[in-house]
Amino acid sequence: MANYFNTLNLRQQLAQLGKCRFMARDEFADGASYLQGKKVVIVGCGAQGLNQGLNMRDSGLDISYALRKEAIAEKRASWRKATENGFKVGTYEELVPQADLVVNLTPDKQHSDVVRSVQPLMKDGAALGYSHGFNIVEVGEQIRKDITVVMVAPKCPGTEVREEYKRGFGVPTLIAVHPENDPKGEGMAIAKAWAAATGGHRAGVLESSFVAEVKSDLMGEQTILCGMLQAGSLLCFDKLVEEGTDPAYAEKLIQFGWETITEALKQGGITLMMDRLSNPAKLRAYALSEQLKEIMAPLFQKHMDDIISGEFSSGMMSDWANDDKNLLTWREETGKTAFETASQFDGKISEQEYFDKGVLMIAMVKAGVELAFETMVDSGIIEESAYYESLHELPLIANTIARKRLYEMNVVISDTAEYGNYLFSYACVPLLKEFMTTLQTGDLGKAVAEGAVDNAQLRDVNEAIRSHAIESVGHTLRGYMKDMKRIAVAG
């Protein structure tokens, strides 16, 4: 198999990278009806598998779970989750031949083995579904020509997919049809019905492509969503302790600071996040973010280049073949860092204190979000896709750090995201070492001193913040998400 994207000519690559259309709500007037009365078999019962299945069943669909024989015989976690929730469970051989739609929600590294097992069992004219297109785009999996291949990719962890559905809402979602596998022209109808069954149509759906979803998803998770948060956590903790801050206080300021800061980002974009600062602090955060963007731009561009070329995927798949040696080594090293092993401060940190004493963290968020967005757009990805893969998902990832630090983040995200996160953070930490020595009092751990502010400078900074392209597209897309619940848990 060959990387699918690399088999396309330049015109085809650009067309698929740039495929992105925000779908009108009336396009989902039929809800999940196209799949009602049909058999949907989900392979895998992890966070996405279970929670999408629960939503789809509650939307009136016939859902069952196909698991490996040994998972059933040994009553593994996937079997327990499916059976405890009242789902029919069977082997591939028992369930797949009757399925109208087989949804592959196993981890990326298992996709080829799963497809190799289920494809011969699928009936003529059935459909195969994914929630991430890595197997199709990067691995270049070849699917039988009579099979329709679709994708429904919720832009949230599986737990959020379920919680928002239970509230009568949903999470923003990308849908796509693989152009090489739509023999009956029904791919879009299947994808729309599946998205509606999960509740995604209530929060906004983008019609995308497998290529655009994969390339933007990889870029977001490697840089701002995971890599920047990990690098920032390690750098900021070490700096605070070096300056004499109690390690326990420093740990709490960072662990819960990302979440508190990005909750403002979720509600009102970079503009609201920056507006939570005093005027002198806002000017300083803006200046720091501009410095960070200049330093980190080549690193962001390298990650995008390696994603576009397939270099990243090739390296990661080589590590898969080597029993995840690099991934497991990096995971162990991260677990031994001073930030991960520090005790936690017992006292309370107020919400505003996280902003006032986290100016550098705010600058890192602003710089990382804007750089990820700009780099994706410069590579041909449409602004709406770039927004969802940068700013939108950041509060959700920050929330995992608030639960159990970097360990929890790396457990919750996919192995693909974790591998890319380590590549970025291992490069970013030394890259910013010299910058960290230039920090001033008030940048981190202490509030910026009050002082005179130049009105013209403040006016220009406010205009620069609000006029960035991500603020414009974000204002529009957040309009569809006003009902999403607040997720921050910091105390």
From Swiss-Prot:
Q: What are the alphabetically sorted keywords of the record?
A: Amino-acid biosynthesis, Branched-chain amino acid biosynthesis, Magnesium, Metal-binding, NADP, Oxidoreductase, Repeat
Q: Write down what this protein is called.
A: Ketol-acid reductoisomerase (NADP(+))
Cellular component aspect of the GO annotation: cytosol
Question: Which residues are recorded as binding Mg(2+) 2?
Answer: 217, 389, 393
- Tell me the cofactor note: Binds 2 magnesium ions per subunit.
Q: Does the keyword Mitochondrion apply?
A: no
User: Which Gene Ontology BP terms does the record give?
Assistant: isoleucine biosynthetic process; L-valine biosynthetic process
Tell me which HAMAP family the record gives.
Answer: IlvC (MF_00435)
All copies of domain KARI N-terminal Rossmann, residue ranges: 15-208
On whether Magnesium is a keyword of this UniProt record, the answer is yes
Which residues of this UniProt protein bind Mg(2+) 1? 217, 221
Record's function text: Involved in the biosynthesis of branched-chain amino acids (BCAA). Catalyzes an alkyl-migration followed by a ketol-acid reduction of (S)-2-acetolactate (S2AL) to yield (R)-2,3-dihydroxy-isovalerate. In the isomerase reaction, S2AL is rearranged via a Mg-dependent methyl migration to produce 3-hydroxy-3-methyl-2-ketobutyrate (HMKB). In the reductase reaction, this 2-ketoacid undergoes a metal-dependent reduction by NADPH to yield (R)-2,3-dihydroxy-isovalerate.
**Cross-referenced Gene3D superfamilies:** N-(1-d-carboxylethyl)-l-norvaline Dehydrogenase, domain 2, NAD(P)-binding Rossmann-like Domain
Binding residues for substrate: 414
- Needed cofactors: Mg(2+)
Q: Where is the active site?
A: 132
Which Gene Ontology terms cover its molecular function? ketol-acid reductoisomerase activity; magnesium ion binding
Q: Which family does it belong to?
A: Belongs to the ketol-acid reductoisomerase family.
Pathway(s) annotated for this protein in UniProt = Amino-acid biosynthesis; L-isoleucine biosynthesis; L-isoleucine from 2-oxobutanoate: step 2/4; Amino-acid biosynthesis; L-valine biosynthesis; L-valine from pyruvate: step 2/4
Instruction: Write down the EC number.
Output: 1.1.1.86
Q: Catalytic activity annotated for this protein?
A: (2R)-2,3-dihydroxy-3-methylbutanoate + NADP(+) = (2S)-2-acetolactate + NADPH + H(+); (2R,3R)-2,3-dihydroxy-3-methylpentanoate + NADP(+) = (S)-2-ethyl-2-hydroxy-3-oxobutanoate + NADPH + H(+)
